[in-house]
A protein has these predicted regions:
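Helix-termini ("caps") and immediately adjacent flexible loops/tails
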Residues: 1-3, 39-184
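Short, low-complexity, glycine-enriched hydrophobic/amphipathic alpha-helices that associate
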Residues: 1-49
Length: 184
């Protein structure tokens, strides 16, 4: 038995918060994604076959991807608030020019592409996390250590599912925004 150390196998204390906004964007997440409390796995005992180290490294990558997606969603939500404000201002002004409308539609389309990219990466990470859960069963970790990793993977999955729902909501909102601009 040797320790799986020196592999950067710390699942980190990630505090993943999704910013909430007032108004139409307020319901995007339906609350805070929640703190993903990672645990140190570097002191886990296992029979060394290399498989465990690779798996932990992959889980760390999944956590990094999850954090990136949360940050992207936060940033996107802030932009959505700004966009919504601009559309409201435009609707209040009867003299809206075509250049302004064209700019807003261009921004909306850009945000839609960003969301679709987030959705794609999010789905890929979700798929990988499911695979890691399966791989974990074939490792020689103790039952207790396996449960620790499974708990972390479960927290990542919950967070990713919330991001997925947020992306779907955001896409619907952007379609509504587009209609408002086109009919202004």
């Amino acid at each position: 038995m040797i320790q799986a150390t020196g592999i950067g196998a710390v699942l980190g204390g990630i505090t993943a918060k999704v910013t909430q906004h007032s108004g139409i964007v307020g319901a995007i997440i339906g609350g805070v994604v929640g703190a993903i409390t990672g645990q140190k796995l570097s002191n886990m005992q296992c029979d060394y076959e290399g498989q465990e180290e690779i798996l932990l490294s992959k889980i760390n990558t999944a956590i990094e991807n999850n954090t990136y997606l949360i940050n992207q969603t936060n940033s996107l939500n802030q932009h959505m608030s700004t966009l919504y404000s601009q559309i409201n201002t435009m609707q209040a002004n009867q003299q809206t020019n075509l250049r302004k409308k064209s700019y807003l539609i261009s921004e909306i389309n850009k945000k839609k592409r960003e969301i679709l990219n987030i959705k794609t990466l999010n789905n890929n990470v979700l798929l990988k996390v499911r695979q890691y859960n399966s791989l974990l069963k074939n490792t020689k970790y103790s039952k207790q250590d396996k449960e620790r990793v499974q708990n972390t993977l479960q927290k990542i999955t919950i967070s990713l599912q919330k991001i997925k729902r947020a992306s779907i909501y955001n896409l619907k909102q952007l379609d509504e925004f587009k209609k408002k601009v086109q009919h202004a």
